[in-house]
Amino acid sequence: MSSTTAQTLPDGVVTLADHEFHARSLLDEAVWAYFNGGAADELTLRANAQAWQTIELLPRVMRQLSGGHTRVNLLGREWPHPILVAPMAYQRLAHPHAEQATALAAAALGAGLVLSTQASTLLEDVARTVL
């Protein structure tokens, strides 16, 4: 994979809505529609969005936090946190280095990557990128 200049997010891109707005400004309309849509009648897409609306965080102030961590052992490997990038098909539509770029970004953040069965890049090529 050849190197390209890394892009940084503009100031103010923080929330999911901010990221969606920024992504839409960068992608062709048909590509945006593909990545922003869901399968068939999009029931699962809407149900997922609704489920996230029900989550509330309860702040706990003045608590003892020493010894706490987010590490998790998964598939015989210790990860710094339980975050994996979900499988996404046809990433080359959004970036010339496709899944290889996503794998590098995930690795830089200590996250795992689940490769789609409809990836734009061979599994072996993605593995060579990060191993």
PLM region descriptions:
Residues 2-79:
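An N-cap/entry alpha-helix motif that binds or orients negatively charged groups
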